[in-house]
Amino acid sequence: RHSFPTRRSSDLQTEKNIFFLFVSFSFIGLIVYVSAILSLAFSRYITSLPIIFLSFGILLGAGNILALFSNKQKINFHFIFIVALIVGGYFTEPHHVVLSKSDPEKEVYKNRQQLKAHFKDWITERKLKLEDETRKEYPIYFVLADGGASRSAYWTASVLSRLEIETKGIFSEKLFCLSGASGGSLGNMAFYAAYHNNNRDTLLREVQQYLSNDFLSFPLVRLMGPDILLPLLPVQIVRDRAVALEQAMKSIPQENSISRFMKKDFSELLNQDDKERKKPIVCINCTRMQDGSPAVLSNIEVNKEVFGNRIDVLKLLNKGEDISVATSVVLGARFPYFSPAGSIKNQYFVDGGYFDNSGAGVVHEMILELQKMINDSLLINPNHPYKKIKFNVIHIANQPSEEIKIQKIHPLINDLAAPIKTIIGSYASQTNINDLRLYKNLLEIYKGDT
């Protein structure tokens, strides 16, 4: 017969104290975690790195509780949870793109200007300068902005702002199109909002101040928590991480013209008033997830005659529906895993960088069509003012252009990761090919003078 040592009451009390402290700290951590999920300001206050550690701790605790119940009840609750997620996904859609309401009898994007009409109106506003006999050429600027998260947004907006300041407003006067993907689109829109505020003295400071804000923490805490449960919820208590990113763009501690602009509907970018100065064309590039087709949100009509099979996302909206500027930017910046594909009528859209990370494709199609129109005009009248027009493409790259070093890879990487490495490499190659096609087209138009 075995005898077991009796535990001293002091040891039991110590264990109780430790357990009490553990539960107390866990409860405090849970309160902080839930507060970060619900409050944009609080998530920014505690910042991204603590959110990562806290979220992993909460998820680990939840996993251990499931394991405890599984062991006690002799039922695999982990398996039940995974099956519930799979089944629930067939009946819910947690990643709808958030649309705003407009006039219920009006399709706000139905009568957008086509490219040629917009170009003619844009040129008419500059007719006197174009016909000035002292001018030998009239440059028109197209901007391409590479994607690359917040870094590319900050870089793009800073470069554009510096151009505007150094040229004393001449740059924006001759700016015809802003095209970009992912963070590049955010940089384009930040500059667009700030320079429309008509204060060059504060332009650079304003865009840099806005883009220095923490846009990561709030969507990150949604990613590492409630987004896992969304397929199980018939009613969304909180929205997904993409909506959290939109909210972060719309609300900053010190509001400025850019954050106010992000709250506006994209329809405010349309050129609807004949008396209003023509706005530049905006192209926010994205990709349809189901088939990898290129898509774009633009303030002009994206028709098949000019843009081929490129999807015009705004045509998918019904009467009485609109989309905010922030939502539009996020739709083209749904970075792999960090943001889910956004759903509009069962069409899912992801980051523009999957297909074209610079926005060169849509600009190339514009220039082809406009140059054809210019050539037709010059055939009729060789002295037409169009002969002075010269298209200039400003490509704001996110990384130094250097040749990739081709070297041996480990056999295990070859066997296990070759498809992944090839797919990742194809994204950059597709963008480079689009950029090169545009460059060669400009070389051909201007006889090698770029």
Task: Tell me the role of every PLM-derived stretch.
Residues 45-83:
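Cytosolic-side transmembrane helix boundary signature
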Residues 1, 31-34, 56-69, 89-95:
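Alpha-helical transmembrane segments
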Residues 396-450:
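C-terminal regions of proteins
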Residues 178-180, 393:
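Conserved alpha/beta-hydrolase fold motif
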Residues 2-9:
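Short, small-residue-biased leader/transition segments that mark boundaries at the very start
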Residues 32-43:
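Juxtamembrane "helix-exit" motif on the non-cytosolic side of transmembrane helices
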Residues 137, 142, 153-157, 161-172, ...:
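Patatin-like phospholipase A catalytic core
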